[in-house]
């Protein structure tokens, strides 16, 4: 079952049935997945005490090794100077690369297979805390978090001291709760097992495997869109599997005395965006500190690391932040562009030159440039996606071969962790919708900024005023967020709750009906926005969408054997960014002003002066021509067509006409991603039968329970 055996954790109830479910989890033998990510082995079978059998026990460490392979000594292969094991010496064992944290009864509570992430845990009496993140959390820190917390709110206040990168699983006063991150980088799913009741995981595919859940055609149809807005982005791909919203946690009450089953789970909100009150100088200081802390949390103490250095401001920022951690060896990787007008490589070379001219005690970074003719076009090697089963189809899938090349080259340098600048655009560019928020409190400043943006984008005056004064509610916008009409022209003002999308001409009537019904159902149920202010709603939704997409990079890294990180998706970075006054955080006259000020003194001023950004649209269009035969093969025997969602004949015609005006107006990347994902998912469940005639639509309230 590709994709299921690499990286996951499961939270189980304290019952005989929960113990039985533990024995059904897919797990490898003692061979590390980094060397063979699709290898299968015997299922993990805990003993009656909840500890695993066999050899290679990591007694009391509660952490996996840096390679995902148990050493049998309890030692991590990742250097962690001065850190303790971060676990109670009385609980937590592992066999192979499976870590078990038991209930007080001894039955398994948390079962985790973290290839690169660390499981840190502590138990004090009946209370317990488990953190799953990029590095080991010392026992003293865990004790300070757990022992001072009397309830959920108290624990959350203490957790805010850590980088916002962890899955949190806690038990206090008999209640268990689980949460991911506010950025959406770490997510939580749950499902009801027929015997064990509610089980939770960070991987929906694992829950689908355990419960026998079939694919949901309505959720699959939604993923054919380029952007899936809140709250529909929470629709899991399997029926009966539910996602807990980012910023929300999942509480799992225990069974009442004398009863056999616990009440059902309920969601609670643990995170609120901070008010935008800080001036630029103070906000920049906090952003810089949060970025530095996140980078240290990922790569601090490692001897050899790598960074993608595109030449843009985001990757340049992380290059210098990583350099500040003083690794023995820092490798910087740049993919040369085919476009002769591209400026990225020039700026990347300038960044390397500046980095090499730093303090003499810091080793000079190595720069590896991948020639443009070695970089695959988009849509190359589409069948290779079967190596990873992502949580959902992701539009970045057509660029997998390019990402795989870059990460493979990074691993070949000996890197033990790779950093990317993903998330920088979503956080620091700023979207026009934000001026709706500013208009309420400071209309003159808002109009001044918006006028500058309007002239840059060519927005007509009257439509801009109309959009600015529009006060439609979120459900009203959601009901009309998809249409069969042509794509909006580029000069259409964007100041609403999101982007209106056109249904693709190759979608079937069945797919269009499913998609439209999903949006209308969410609107009819009065779906609430992420934030009452449009700009903040759109900004946070964009960050969470980007965090979802980044999962594809993480999974490719797992396949290769190299952990990949995007420090910008740290909750502390998100919070520091949102806390800055809107009129200072974004500007039509400055490029990413908050990030620029945050990096002063870290990144040389000459590099902070860049105001341009390259794009790879030409590589995508050329990829349609270069890989026309692969695309034709993809649509021959299309699984999406079997589900009644796309017209395979229409797609075959487009494969033969790569420069068709249809493909200029409508991107095909999400459809390609859906097709390749579906093939991988059906390989994982070979008995799965398509249901192209199904007309039922799961309403949002049902899907989000």
Residue ranges and their predicted role:
Residues 153, 213-219, 528-541, 588-590, ...:
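Structural motif
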Residues 520-553, 560:
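Alpha/beta-hydrolase fold catalytic core
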Residues 175-177, 254-259, 270-514, 556-565, ...:
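ATP-dependent adenylate-handling active sites, centered on carboxylate activation for C-N bond formation
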Residues 221-229, 405-408, 540-555, 666-684:
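Short, hydrophobic/amphipathic alpha-helical patches that form generic packing surfaces
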Residues 637-705:
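Acidic, carboxylate-rich catalytic segments that either coordinate divalent cations
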Residues 1-56, 60, 66, 72, ...:
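Cysteine-centered catalytic environments shared across enzyme families
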Residues 432, 602-665:
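PAPS-dependent sulfotransferase catalytic core
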């Amino acid at each position: 079952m590709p994709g299921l055996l690499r990286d996951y954790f499961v939270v189980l109830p304290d019952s005989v049935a929960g113990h039985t479910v533990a024995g059904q989890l897919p797990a490898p033998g003692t061979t590390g997945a980094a060397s063979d990510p699709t290898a299968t082995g015997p299922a993990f079978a805990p003993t009656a005490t909840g500890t695993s059998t066999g050899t290679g026990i990591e007694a009391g460490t509660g952490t996996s090794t840096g390679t995902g392979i148990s050493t049998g000594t309890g030692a991590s292969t990742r250097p962690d100077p001065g850190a303790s094991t971060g676990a109670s010496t009385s609980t937590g064992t592992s066999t192979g690369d499976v870590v078990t944290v038991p209930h007080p009864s001894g039955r398994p509570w948390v079962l985790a297979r973290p290839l690169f992430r660390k499981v840190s845990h502590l138990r004090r009496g009946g209370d317990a805390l488990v953190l799953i993140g990029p590095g080991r959390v010392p026992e003293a820190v865990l004790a300070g978090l757990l022992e001072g917390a009397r309830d959920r709110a108290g624990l959350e206040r203490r957790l805010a001291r850590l980088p916002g990168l962890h899955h949190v699983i806690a038990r206090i006063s008999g209640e268990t709760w689980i949460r991911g991150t506010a950025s959406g980088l770490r997510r939580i799913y749950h499902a009801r097992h027929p015997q064990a009741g509610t089980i939770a995981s960070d991987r929906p595919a694992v829950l689908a495997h355990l419960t026998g859940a079939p694919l949901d055609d309505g959720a699959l149809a939604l993923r054919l869109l380029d952007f899936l807005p809140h709250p529909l982005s929470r629709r899991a791909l399997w029926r009966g599997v539910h996602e807990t919203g980012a910023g929300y946690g999942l509480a799992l009450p225990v069974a009442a005395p004398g009863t056999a089953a616990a009440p059902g789970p309920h969601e609670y909100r643990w995170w609120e965006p901070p008010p935008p009150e800080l001036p630029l100088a103070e906000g920049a200081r906090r952003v810089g500190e949060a970025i530095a802390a996140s980078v240290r949390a990922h790569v601090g103490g490692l001897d050899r690391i790598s960074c993608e250095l595109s030449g843009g401001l985001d990757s340049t920022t992380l290059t210098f932040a990583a350099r500040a951690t003083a690794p023995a060896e820092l490798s910087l990787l740049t993919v040369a562009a085919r476009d002769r007008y591209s400026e990225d490589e020039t700026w990347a070379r300038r960044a390397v030159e500046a980095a090499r001219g730093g303090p003499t005690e810091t080793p000079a970074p190595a720069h590896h440039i991948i020639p443009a003719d070695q970089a695959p076009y988009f849509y190359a090697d589409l069948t290779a996606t079967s190596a990873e089963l992502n949580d959902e189809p992701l539009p970045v899938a057509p660029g997998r071969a390019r990402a795989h090349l870059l990460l493979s080259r990074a691993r070949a340098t000996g890197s033990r962790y790779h950093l990317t600048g993903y998330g920088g655009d979503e956080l620091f560019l700023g979207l026009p919708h934000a001026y709706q928020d500013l208009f309420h409190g400071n209309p003159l400043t808002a109009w001044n900024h918006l006028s500058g943006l309007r002239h840059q984008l060519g927005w007509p005056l009257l439509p801009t005023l109309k959009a600015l004064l529009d006060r439609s509610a979120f459900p009203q916008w959601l009901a009309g967020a998809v249409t069969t009409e042509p794509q909006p022209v580029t000069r259409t003002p964007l100041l609403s709750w999101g982007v209106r999308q056109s249904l693709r001409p190759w979608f079937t009537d069945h797919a269009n009906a499913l998609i439209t019904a999903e949006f209308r159902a969410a609107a009819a149920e009065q779906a609430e926005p992420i934030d009452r202010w449009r700009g903040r709603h759109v900004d946070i939704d964009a960050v969470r969408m980007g965090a979802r997409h980044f999962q594809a990079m993480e999974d490719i890294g797992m396949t290769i054997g190299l952990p990949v990180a995007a420090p910008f998706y740290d909750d502390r970075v998100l919070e520091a960014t949102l806390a800055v006054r809107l009129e200072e955080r974004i500007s039509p006259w400055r490029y990413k002003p908050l990030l620029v000020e945050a990096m002063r003194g870290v990144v040389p001023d000459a590099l902070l002066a860049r105001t341009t950004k390259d794009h790879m649209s030409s590589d995508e269009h050329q990829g349609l021509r270069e890989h026309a035969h692969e695309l034709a093969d993809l649509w021959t025997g299309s699984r999406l067509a079997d589900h009644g969602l796309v017209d395979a004949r229409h797609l075959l015609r487009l494969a033969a006409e790569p420069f068709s005006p249809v493909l200029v107006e409508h991107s095909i990347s999400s459809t390609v991603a859906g097709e390749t994902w579906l093939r991988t998912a059906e390989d994982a469940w070979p008995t799965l039968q398509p249901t192209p005639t199904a007309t039922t639509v799961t309403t949002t309230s049902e899907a989000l329970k």
